UniProtKB/Swiss-Prot annotation:
Disulfide bonds: none annotated. It is a multi-pass membrane protein. InterPro entries: CASP/CASPL (IPR006459), CASP_dom (IPR006702), CASPL (IPR044173). Residues 1-62, 132-145, 222-224 are cytoplasmic. Keywords: Cell membrane, Cell wall biogenesis/degradation, Membrane, Transmembrane, Transmembrane helix. It comes from Oryza sativa subsp. japonica. One of its GO terms (biological process) is cell wall modification. This is Casparian strip membrane protein 1.
Length: 224
């Protein structure tokens, strides 16, 4: 080949009809003419603004809020049990010249312990509400949560002992004990037995809520 002849250009043919493949020279122009895509908009978060702050603390904050609600719920039965026991005194209309038949809660040491324990637990639940509110705001405070856990366990143990002792006396008042020749007194003192029985039920309900509080605190500390 001489230097004056134009160089031959080879075009590859891949199909069976002898046609050259189409060139893609118009593709960049079409891409340039296409409008720019709009920037992606992040989805707006929906929910309570207080619980949206600090997503990494959301679970602990929800547990702390549930702890606060349960403390309010436990305060009612504990206070009701203390008031019902303290006002359970009953005096029969039948009496003699020298003796008057009556039933008083302070005649039974178990009921006296029961009343004091429920009053202490009710007062503790009220005093613990500000600390529980602090944990809702600052869920990362482990020391305060550990303090409430220990106090909740102490209150639950004390109230369980008091409610169990009172339940034994209530059962004795309803059924008596034939072997010991102790007669049931609920046949005569209806109001006394109704109030003390309701107090025991309310107190055990408080114990159940306190156990839930202990479990919640343990789960929160374990997450940390």
């Amino acid at each position: 080949m001489s230097s004056g002849e134009p160089a031959a250009v080879s075009i590859p043919i891949h199909d069976h009809h002898g046609k050259a493949p189409a060139t893609s020279s118009a593709v960049p122009a079409a891409a340039a003419a296409a409008p720019a895509a709009a920037p992606a908009v992040a989805p707006r978060k929906v929910g309570i603004p207080f619980f949206r702050r600090g997503d990494h603390h959301r679970g602990s904050r929800c547990l702390a809020f549930l702890d606060f609600i349960l403390r309010i719920a436990a305060f009612g039965p504990a206070l009701a049990a203390a008031i019902s026991t303290g006002t359970s005194d009953e005096t029969l209309s039948v009496f003699t010249e020298f003796y008057q038949f009556r039933a008083r809660f302070d005649d039974f040491p178990a009921f006296l312990f029961f009343l004091v324990a429920n009053a202490i637990v009710a007062g503790y639940l009220v005093l613990s509400l500000p600390f529980s509110a602090v944990l809702v705001i600052r869920p990362q405070t482990i020391g305060l949560r550990l303090l409430l856990l220990v106090c909740d366990m102490i209150m639950a143990a004390m109230l369980t002992a008091a409610a169990s002792a009172a339940a034994a006396i209530v059962d004795l008042a309803h059924n008596g004990n034939l072997r010991a020749n102790w007669v049931a007194i609920c046949m005569q003192f209806h109001g006394f037995c109704q109030r003390t029985s309701g107090s025991v039920v309310a107190s055990f309900l408080t114990v159940v809520i306190l156990m839930f509080l202990v479990i919640l605190a343990a789960c929160s500390i374990r997450k940390r």
